[in-house]
Swiss-Prot record:
Record localization: Cytoplasm; Nucleus; Nucleus, Nucleolus; Nucleus, Nucleoplasm
Lineage: Eukaryota, Metazoa, Chordata, Craniata, Vertebrata
Similarity comment: family membership: Belongs to the SNF2/RAD54 helicase family. RAD16 subfamily.
UniProt feature, compositional bias: Basic and acidic residues: 348-359
Keyword Cytoplasm on entry: yes
Purpose of the protein: Has both helicase and E3 ubiquitin ligase activities. Possesses intrinsic ATP-dependent nucleosome-remodeling activity; This activity may be required for transcriptional activation or repression of specific target promoters. These may include the SERPINE1 and HIV-1 promoters and the SV40 enhancer, to which this protein can bind directly. Plays a role in error-free postreplication repair (PRR) of damaged DNA and maintains genomic stability through acting as a ubiquitin ligase for 'Lys-63'-linked polyubiquitination of chromatin-bound PCNA.
Protein name: Helicase-like transcription factor
Modified residues (Phosphoserine): S397, S398, S400
Cross-link (Glycyl lysine isopeptide (Lys-Gly) (interchain with G-Cter in SUMO2)): K112, K211
Listed GO biological process terms: chromatin organization; DNA repair; mRNA transcription by RNA polymerase II; positive regulation of transcription by RNA polymerase II; protein ubiquitination; regulation of neurogenesis
């Protein structure tokens, strides 16, 4: 039998639907006939240092100099205070001028002209990071001494030394002191930095000690005074569990706190920062917020909703209106094709649903909508989100993130009127366009009841006003920012947990016609939006409405999304104005300690708003194994973070009494034909890579190594996945420009068309506009362009350190990927050893208990498409969730799967990447992992989607691993990663040579060299 990938109109998704985290570069959604790929973890992300992290990992030495011009500037410093050096190239008197600033950014003075002449070249070419401390003489009138340390990459040491020699300066040995007192905690009675402490007295901790300390880092959070419980506001209907009451009490106390921030203390009339020794007269702003880092599945969303309703101003609950029960609610008849409020008028069934599952897509419903405003946006969504079993859905359309709303499967008790035609009928003359955002907002917040009949007050009118909100009014609105994938979950959670007669002004800021009036948005109780919308508005000309408002509270869901400080998304978040700030994340540190800085900067924790002070006082000392740095980190984390895991105990009982989770490995033996193909590809690849080892060029050919590993992993799943089109021969010096281009494009197609979850080694996120360098490494275009810009004029590849140039970056034309996919679409389908094992397990499970639901997970989305065929043939009802699906289809798929009625899907085909964020799939109690991931944390995140709050059955996970294959070797690497995970943030970062050697050893392990 022949088969094809054919689901939606081909070019519907080839568009700039979402903006990635890098500003104006769009994240493309490729046509659905492209091989399905969502990139993650082909390269283990922990193994690579980004350019800014690597830049100051080696201490070159120290230099004494002087700060002059003190009488001309208002900035002051204390003895032993850290200062920052800043280039001032536009200085009219000296193009080499270098400012000396205190922690507040106020200029204290400048370097003497001769010294500035030597250092300007080093700073401009980013050869070293130069850091200063004023050891004494802070009260001098004209000049003060400055002790400077030089940090950089080992390869730049000689260039720095030569530049200084040219100007008559010479670096001294590593200083006898570090410029901060390791014994000084942030609550001590003396200033932090002190030159009295010899550097050799610093305690260098072993990897094992650091691992133990990091294990304790979050454990200690459970043992202190965060055990007080608090009942939520009366408007909350769902009873809180004890750990949620504790979190509520802690969050309310943080929001109302009058304490000084960590590392600050008052001495007479001054406020001292004890780690930089900076002081000022103005009291530093309190940190009204923190990080709620509870494990996934412990109900952080409900806790956040409780905080919003419980703690408004002056410790009082949010003032709310009650809806009278005798209000009449109109219900109208909906014609079959009446509900298309935005996007394309398609009537297709859910992407990936089998025929039997189509019952999940019934007629959508929406309540009556009235226009009451003179604004083009007719009405804010000003009623409580409706309690429902189903979620609002969205569809991506051709020119922007347009939205379609509908209800999912339910037996409709009433009938609704054709909203579209009615809206048109009432619209002003000359405005016949349906206003999607009006219908969308109201659809989110009012719909036909699914259980009880509930009376909803129809909304407040939009009030005309100026763009600026009244500065004298105390802010009212909470802004919630989340990934698109969990937008519908927030709406559902508000509907589920708030009492039926409570009226909230709730607006979903999303879609092409969203209200952009700050005066109107600031009148809401809650505004909900996505990171992409926030970033898009931030990058457009004119003021972003969300940045024109001072919010009462900003909540970041999946807050680790801002971990990349260079991303436009992070900058957009950090620029928001708010009284209170919260980060919700189960993984505050994902890859390294540097992930924390953006979160601390978002919380406005002075002096860490400036990355330099975080790096100098905590990040670098901790990563170099310094005990004092670790102690500061522990104090900081303990102050601003609350974390409980599923194994945490409250009053002797587990926080969450979940059923047991068991993991089994089922070994698969390849058939003779599969083994023959596997061995042939392996032998050919080993010969080529062995030659690279002998020549010492293995990392220069890293794309070839990745290609071989991908092909071996694909054969383990299904030989159909094998990509033969790519030659393993790397670029040679004899290639013409056109031959080189073709070879590089072929290499990139190998990675992109594999259906794997590839990540960029710079930002550790999914590839955004992938490009390949002449040294055959694939990165996000905005990421690698930023590296090139930062390292001008001598930019080097972050992976192999070869020279790279922006002009030589190559993008893969989408039509080439399409052609490759079309060539394969008519092939005959055959099974594989893994598919046989899966089908045997599923069939056996159905015989024992036909109601048990299963997740079938793979990184290769093309493999999921292959699995669909035997599932259909065997009569299984299944649905699918992967990153290529529009949000509407995703929500529909999840709701169908979570439905417990007879005939609902018992299997979900899930891509590993799509299963990693914010989903609740607790209906499933069986997981079949078809192929191992490089990063075990990615697997664990996926497993947590079903092993979470609401799970009533024992969860059994089966990993299919092919015997005598690259998959068994991947398990060895996974185990190493698990062992290092707890201590990874505290262990000393490897230098470039150590990192390369570790990578080489890993390659040897994987291909048995």
């Amino acid at each position: 039998m022949s088969w094809m990938f054919k689901r939606d109109p081909v070019w519907k998704y080839l568009q700039t639907v979402q903006y990635g985290v890098h500003g104006n570069f769009p994240r493309l959604s490729y046509p659905t006939f492209f091989p399905r790929f969502e990139f993650q973890d082909v390269i283990p992300p922990d193994d690579f240092l980004t350019s800014d992290e690597e830049v100051d990992s080696v201490l070159f030495g120290s230099l004494r100099g002087h700060v002059v011009g003190l009488r001309y500037y208002t900035g002051v410093v204390n003895n032993n205070e850290m200062v920052a050096l800043q280039r001032d190239p536009n200085n009219p008197y000296d193009k080499n001028a270098i400012k000396v600033n205190n922690v507040n950014g106020n200029q204290v003075g400048h370097l003497k002209k001769e010294l500035a002449g030597a250092l300007a070249y080093i700073m401009d070419n980013k050869l070293a990071q130069i850091e200063g401390v004023v050891p004494f003489g802070a009260n001098n009138a004209f000049t003060m001494p400055l002790h400077m340390t030089f940090w950089g990459k080992e390869e730049n040491r000689k260039a720095v030394s030569d530049q200084l020699k040219k100007h008559g300066f010479k670096l001294g040995p590593a200083p006898k002191t570090l410029g901060f007192n390791l014994e000084s905690g942030w609550g001590s009675g003396r200033a932090g930095p002190s030159y009295s402490m010899p550097v050799h007295a610093a305690v260098q901790m072993t990897t094992e000690q650091l691992k133990t300390e990091f294990d304790k880092l979050f454990e200690d959070l459970k043992e202190d005074d965060k055990t007080h419980e608090m009942e939520p506001a009366e408007a909350i209907e769902t009873p809180l569990l004890p750990h949620q009451k504790q979190a509520l009490a802690w969050m309310v106390s943080r929001e109302n706190s009058k304490e000084l921030p960590p590392f600050w203390e008052q001495r007479n009339d001054l406020y001292y920062n004890t780690i930089t020794n900076f002081s000022e007269k103005d009291r530093p702003e309190n940190v009204h917020g923190g990080i709620l880092a509870d494990d996934m599945g412990l109900g952080k969303t409900l806790t956040a909703i409780a905080v919003i309703l419980t703690n408004f101003h002056d410790g009082r609950p949010l003032p709310i209106e009650r809806v009278k029960k005798n209000l009449l609610k109109k219900e109208y008849n909906v014609n079959d094709d009446s509900m298309k409020l935005g996007g394309n008028n398609t009537s297709e069934k859910a992407d990936g649903l089998s025929k039997d599952a189509s019952r999940c897509s019934e007629q959508p419903s929406i309540s009556d909508i009235k226009e009451k405003s003179k604004f083009r946006m007719s009405e804010l969504s000003s009623s409580r989100p409706k309690r429902r079993k189903t979620a609002v859905q969205y569809i991506e359309s051709s020119d922007s993130e347009e939205i379609e709303t509908s209800e999912l499967p339910q037996k409709m008790k009433g009938k609704l009127k054709n909203v579209q035609s009615e809206t048109k009928g009432r619209a002003k003359a000359g405005s016949s366009k349906v206003i999607e955002d009006v219908a969308f907002a109201c659809a989110l917040t009012s719909s036909v009841p699914t259980t009880k009949k509930k009376m909803l007050k129809k909304g407040a009118c939009a009030v005309e006003g100026s763009k600026k909100t009244d500065v004298e009014e105390r802010p009212r609105t909470t802004l919630i920012i989340c990934p698109l994938s969990v937008l519908s979950n927030w709406i559902d959670q508000f509907g589920q947990h708030i009492k039926s007669d409570v009226h909230l002004n709730f607006y979903v800021y999303y879609g092409p016609d969203r209200i952009r009036e700050p005066a109107l948005l600031s009148k809401q109780d809650i505004v909900l939006t996505t990171y992409n919308i926030l970033t898009h508005d931030y990058g457009t000309k004119g003021d972003s409405p969300l940045h024109s408002i001072r919010w009462l509270r900003v909540i970041l869901d999946e807050g680790h999304a801002i971990r990349n400080p260079n991303a436009q998304q992070t900058k957009a978040v950090l620029d928001l104005e708010s009284e209170r700030r919260w980060v919700l994340t189960g993984t505050p540190i994902q890859n390294s300690l540097k992930d924390l800085w953006s979160l601390l900067s978002f919380l406005k924790l002075k002096p860490f708003i400036d990355r330099e002070w975080w790096h100098r006082t905590i990040q670098r000392p901790v990563t170099m194994g310094d005990e004092g740095g670790l102690r500061r980190l522990q104090s900081l984390i303990k102050n601003i973070t609350l974390r409980r895991t599923k194994t945490s105990k409250i009053k002797g009982k587990p926080v969450l009494e979940l059923p047991e989770r068991k993991v089994f490995i089922q070994h698969i033996t390849l058939s003779d034909e599969e083994r023959k193909i596997y061995q042939s590809v392996k032998n050919e690849g080993r010969a080529t890579i062995g030659r690279y080892f002998n020549e010492g060029t293995v990392l220069a050919h890293y794309a070839d190594v990745l290609g071989l590993l991908l092909r071996l992993r694909q054969i383990c799943c299904h030989t159909y996945l094998l990509t033969n089109a790519v030659s393993s021969n790397g670029p040679s010096g004899n290639d013409t420009p056109e031959e080189l281009r073709k070879k590089l494009i072929r290499k990139m197609k190998l990675i992109l068309s594999s259906g794997s979850d590839e990540e960029c080694a710079i930002c550790l996120d999914s590839l955004t506009v992938p490009v390949i360098t002449h040294c055959a490494h694939v990165f996000c275009k905005p990421c690698i362009c930023q590296v090139i810009q930062n390292e001008q004029p001598h930019a080097k590849c972050p992976l192999c350190r070869n020279d790279i140039h922006e002009d030589n970056l190559l993008e893969c034309p989408p039509e080439e990927l399409a052609r490759d996919s079309e060539k394969k679409s008519d092939m005959e389908w055959t099974s594989s050893s893994k598919i046989n094992a899966l089908m045997h397990a599923l069939t056996d499970l159905r015989k024992k208990n036909p109601n048990i639901k299963s997740l079938v997970v793979s990184q290769f989305t093309t493999f999921l498409s292959l699995i669909e065929i035997p599932l259909k043939a065997s009569g299984f009802v299944f649905t699918r969730l992967d990153g290529s699906m529009a949000q509407k289809k995703r929500v529909e798929s999840i709701q169908c799967f979570q439905n417990t009625e007879a005939g609902s899907p018992t299997i979900m085909l899930l891509s590993l990447k799509a299963g990693g964020v914010g989903l609740n799939l607790s209906a499933a109690s069986r997981v079949f992992l078809m192929d191992p991931a490089w990063n075990p944390a990615a697997e664990d995140q996926c497993f947590d989607r079903c092993h979470r709050l609401g799970q009533k059955q024992e969860v059994i996970i089966t990993k299919f691993i092919v015997k005598d294959s690259v998959e068994e070797n991947m398990l060895k690497i996974q185990n190493k990663k698990r062992e290092l995970a707890a201590g990874a943030f505290g262990t000393k970062k490897p230098n470039a040579d150590e990192m390369k050697q570790a990578k080489i050893n890993e390659i040897r392990t994987l291909i048995d060299l």
